Amino acid sequence: MDEKLIIKKFIIRKLYRKRMWLHKHTNIHNLPKGLSNELRVSREIKSAIDELLKEQILLSKPTHYGLEISLNPKKVKEIEELVN
């Protein structure tokens, strides 16, 4: 499987499992935690997160302490396809 796809699925599953929808969010720096060291240090993480934001699967909320990320409830079907 492609590294970027593995990272995307991991991030989506993590947020889905913790029910991070719309107003419940987490810091962008917490997303790669739990990945293997190989994938965590790769440059694919940043591009995978950027792609998910562009596809509007992830929503971003800028705060004074950093960027917060949550799942988009309007994209539930696409998110569930990635999770399963």
Regions found by a protein language model. Name each.
Residues 1-23, 83:
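Short alpha-helical segments that sit at the start of domains
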Residues 21-35:
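Short acidic, hydrophobic short linear motifs in intrinsically disordered regions
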Residues 37, 71-73:
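Short beta-strand-to-loop capping motifs
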Residues 38-54:
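Short amphipathic alpha-helical interaction segments
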Residues 53-63:
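A short, conserved structural fragment
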Residues 65-71:
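Minor-groove-contacting beta-hairpin "wing" of winged helix-turn-helix DNA-binding domains
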Residues 74-84:
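Short, amphipathic alpha-helical interaction segments positioned at domain boundaries
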